[in-house]
Amino acid sequence: MSKLNLEKKLKIVKEAKKLNIKKSTYLANKYDISVDTVESLVNRFEAFRIEGLINKEKKPYYSAKLKLKIVLYKLETNHSYDEVAKKFNIIYSSTIAGWVKKYREYGFLGLNNNIGRPKKIMKNPNKKPAKIKKSQVKINNDQQIKELKEQVEYYKLEAEFWKKFHTLLTKEKSTRKKQK
């Protein structure tokens, strides 16, 4: 499978539109790509036009709050990843799938961005750490306060999620009872 440039992607989408199909084994074989890739290209073009086909050099940044909002929307509405991606203007639906997986494994903390290089561990155990200045203590306290506020926000959102989840369950149970 070769990496597709923008011209090739547009050509594939144009041919798929001409044939009036989204999935095509003919196009997949012709361009040596998977059928799912053909479908993905057509869907991204329909949703975002040419912008959906352009490879970004830099990944877009999404805040943890936005990720949580999108994940909760996905879990509450049970829409497909593609539908949720269209609603929130996220080009790749697999991005949302990754967020949902992280949320299920680690909760809200799994949605935080770990950008950059991880901190180095002190290699020499005999080396003493530098003395901490008062200004650094203030910064550490401010950082700790910020982290605690984020935790409070997380627990509020989590409580809200479980309340909504509970109401959905009770609605579902009542509809099942009515059907019987």
From Swiss-Prot:
What highest taxon heads this organism's lineage? Answer: Bacteria
List the InterPro entries: Homeodomain-like_sf, InsJ-like_HTH, IS150/IS1296_orfA-like, WH-like_DNA-bd_sf
What's the short name of a Pfam family annotated to this entry?
HTH_28
Write out the entry's keywords from A to Z.
Transposable element
Instruction: Identify this protein by name.
Output: Insertion element IS1296 uncharacterized 21.4 kDa protein
Question: Which family does the similarity line name?
Answer: Belongs to the IS150/IS1296 orfA family.
Keyword Iron-sulfur carried by entry: no
Q: Does the keyword Aminoacyl-tRNA synthetase apply?
A: no
